[in-house]
Every structure is written in C-alpha cells, then in structure tokens.
Design a protein with these regions (language model features):
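N-terminal lobe of the biotin/lipoate ligase/transferase fold
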Residues: 1-98
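Short, glycine/charge-rich beta-strand/loop segments that flank catalytic centers
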Residues: 39-41, 120-130
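FAD-binding core of FAD-dependent oxidoreductases
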Residues: 70-85, 126-128, 132, 137-146
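Contiguous, small/hydrophobic- and glycine-enriched helical/loop subdomains that border
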Residues: 83-124
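A generic structural motif
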Residues: 90-96, 187-193, 278-283
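Long, positively charged amphipathic alpha-helical accessory segments at protein N-termini or as interdomain linkers
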Residues: 107, 114, 134, 142-241, ...
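Short beta-strand elements
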Residues: 137-138, 151, 253, 261-279
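Structured beta-strand/loop patches that form or line metal/cofactor-binding pockets in enzymes
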Residues: 223-268
C-alpha cells in the first residue's frame, strides 16, 4: 500500500490531535499515513478516562501543563519535548482485531540499528530491559485504524511522575485508571549519543525504507479545517474535562485549631454534582449549606474560589480560613 507521511513541526497538543483526527476522517483512504509529532508540556488522557482522576491538578496549574483528551482509549501520558510521538493510519478491512505489534515493530527495528534491544511487551508497551519507554493505543472505526504511540527519548521523568501523581486511596472512579509502570528513556541505553532530532530523522528514514512514500501535500483548506477542529473540540473544556465519567474524590486533612475535615466530592461531566463534609470540627452553621455553593463548579482552585466568593468559611469550620479550605479541596 502507498504511504504518505506528515512530519509535524508544531508542539501544540490540541492542534496535533486535531490533525490526527482530520487525517483519519478526511484524507483519501487509498494509502497508509505515517505521522511524527511532539507535544510540549502536556498531559494526554485516554478517551474513557476521568481527567480529574488522572492529573495532579496543582502540578498542572503551577507548571502550565496543557491537558487534552485523545480519541483512543488507554491511559494518561505526559509529553514534553524529550518525547516523540508516532501515528499510523490505515484501513484494516472487515476485522477490527488488529495486533498492536504490527505498528510497534518498526520502532524496535530502528532501535536495533542503533544498538538498542527493545521488545514489544504486554498489551501495548515497548520496553528496554523490562522498562517501558513507549505506550501505544488505537482508535478503530468503520474499517479504519489510528495507531499512535509515545517514544520517551529524553523526557523529564520527575515531571512525568509528578504530573500524573494522584493518591489512589483518595479517589474512586468509573473511568479507566492509568497503570503506572516502570519507565525509562531511550537515550540512557544508546551505545553512542544520538540527539532526538537525529533519531527522528533515522526513524522516518527507516519507515520509508520499509514502506516507500512521500510527504502528503496539505492544502490551505486542509489546514483551515484542522484549525477549526482544534478550536471546536481539542481546545475546549467540554471535550478535555467535561467528557469525563463520574468520580468521587476524598480530600482530608487535620488542621490545628480546627480538627479533621473530610470532603467527599462527586464529579460528573467535569463539574461537581455533590459535595459532603465530614469530620470532628465545630460548626456554627450547617456544612451542607456551604457544600451547596460548590455544585456546578469545576473541581479546581479557580472553581473553588468562585464558589466560595466572600463566604465566611469560619462559620462552618471554626478556626479555618477560606484559603485553607481551598488548599484541602485541591490537595487533601
């Protein structure tokens, strides 16, 4: 089958995911497409995940991390400019059962040429010495498959763990939780130093050696349609957060001079549907009155600040200030 490739130069995650969908939905189906792309400082969550359950909201806010939902299932991943993403888009005929190894092996073979022994391991990972450096997922519809994967080449592993860190004892969700795995960077295993741009070039060359092809000539109409899709879906709160299934979060903290405060937060479609306070605190007014202020707001610092407004929190939790309550709701 003829192959066309797109080597994307933007690092905007909402644009890159919009481009994937546009290629999948709109470009001619008489060929296979291969894409290379990078996202800068982003968390990409799986289609069926609860965004709030997957991210460290404080780290996301402080580091300016962009959060975008993709079309395929699977777990949440952190992308920075030390990570390279690849995508195959092609027809699969009548069968929707496709082995992910088919699309992972070109990465394995490319690494072999650089002296690194990698292997496809488990359901959707590529590993080196048992450590994961590539996670893969697929979106299949109407006889067509989009297979995409990450390649952690020289990512900041501290930020990878921090951005996705959520205490599993504090949250219950109907969405699909990401499976945390031991991870590694490809660069650590290379016998000779190779920069990421050079690796990107080598991978593309190897793909084209196995599947001769040429760059796909996107038109101005194509680019305008991608931008429209980005703006209307991948850059929207409704898609990235509001699509989330229901979850219940527990935030708890003991505060000197106040006591133990527990907040049970139920989130549906990305907004608070219910909130219940429990604990051994003293209260001059019923905490349920305060809890009602939060219904309909987003479960983040901005949402909590808006919900509380100029409410005197100490009426409901003796000895507690508004900023302290917001910290509890955000961090536990």
């Amino acid at each position: 089958m003829k192959l066309s490739y797109l080597d994307l130069m933007t690092s905007d995650p909402s644009y890159n995911l919009a481009m994937e969908q546009y290629v999948f939905d709109c470009l001619p189906r008489d060929r296979m497409y291969f894409m290379l792309w990078q996202n800068d400082n982003a968390i990409i969550v799986g289609k069926y995940q609860n965004t709030i359950a997957e991210i460290n909201e404080e780290a996301v806010r402080e580091r300016g991390i962009r959060v975008v939902r993709r079309l395929s299932g699977g777990g949440a991943v952190y992308h920075d400019m030390g990570n390279l993403n690849f995508t195959f888009i092609t027809d699969v005929g009548e069968s929707n059962a496709l082995d992910l190894k088919l699309f992972c092996e070109p990465v394995v073979r490319t690494l072999a040429t650089l002296g690194v022994k990698a292997e496809v391991n488990g359901r959707n990972d590529i590993t080196i010495d048992g450590k994961k450096f590539s996670g893969n997922s697929q979106y299949i519809r109407q006889g067509r498959v989009m297979h995409h994967g990450t390649i952690m080449f020289d990512s900041d592993l501290f930020v990878v763990s921090e951005a996705l860190r959520v205490d599993p004892t504090k949250i219950q969700t109907k969405g699909i939780r990401s499976v945390r795995s031991r991870v590694t960077n490809v660069a650590e295993h290379l016998p000779e130093k190779v920069a990421l741009p050079e690796f990107r070039r080598i991978l593309l060359e190897n793909i084209l050696k196995e599947n001769p092809g040429e760059a796909y000539p996107l038109t101005q109409d194509d680019l305008a349609a991608v931008e429209k899709l980005r703006a209307e879906r991948y850059a929207t709160w409704d898609w990235n957060y509001g699509f989330s299934p229901a979850c219940t979060m527990l935030r708890r903290r003991r505060v000197d001079g106040c006591g133990m405060i527990e907040a049970y937060i139920t989130v549906e479609h990305g907004k608070i549907a219910a909130l219940t306070f429990k604990g051994d605190f003293f209260s001059a007014s019923e905490p349920d009155e305060l809890a009602a202020h939060f219904v309909g707001c987003t479960p983040d610092r901005a949402g909590y600040e808006k919900a509380l407004g100029d409410v005197d929190v100490s009426r409901y939790f003796a000895g507690l200030q508004k900023d302290e309550l917001i910290d509890i709701l955000c961090e536990g």
